Amino acid sequence: MRSISGIGETAIHVTDMELSLQFYQKLFGFKKITGDKRFAALRVTPHQVFLLFKSGGTLEPAQVPGGIIPPHHSQGQLHFGFTIPAAEWSAWHQHLRHHNIAIESEVNWAPDVRSLYFRDPDGHLVELATPGVWDTN
């Protein structure tokens, strides 16, 4: 049986990165763990990250050391990720194939730390990731 062990990350698009960062940090106490002019990753809990993307900043694929993060933008398509146990990686692959879900991309962040990406019926980018993608300490 496959299982979801939590929401690892949730993303939104913002027009003013600094204003949004101040809002989420001050209002909720989220701590910024990484980012640049294009994005910011905020720690929500020890196992949850809230991502802010500058509107238009994710229209092109993003090359990262372990692979490619597919494009996703603010015109209706959102991105969110679910954490899955590393031991269930193959079971999830099989489950997605069984339901004719095309995997758009995979990223190998580190040994046994992986993400796979696919689209939901509305085109939202869904990520399944094993633990360890984000250092939330």
What is each PLM-predicted segment?
Residues 1-7, 14-33, 44-103, 119-137:
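Glyoxalase I/VOC metalloenzyme domain signal
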Residues 36, 111-113:
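Short, small/polar residue-rich loop motifs at catalytic or cofactor-binding pockets
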Residues 106-108:
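Specificity-determining recognition surfaces
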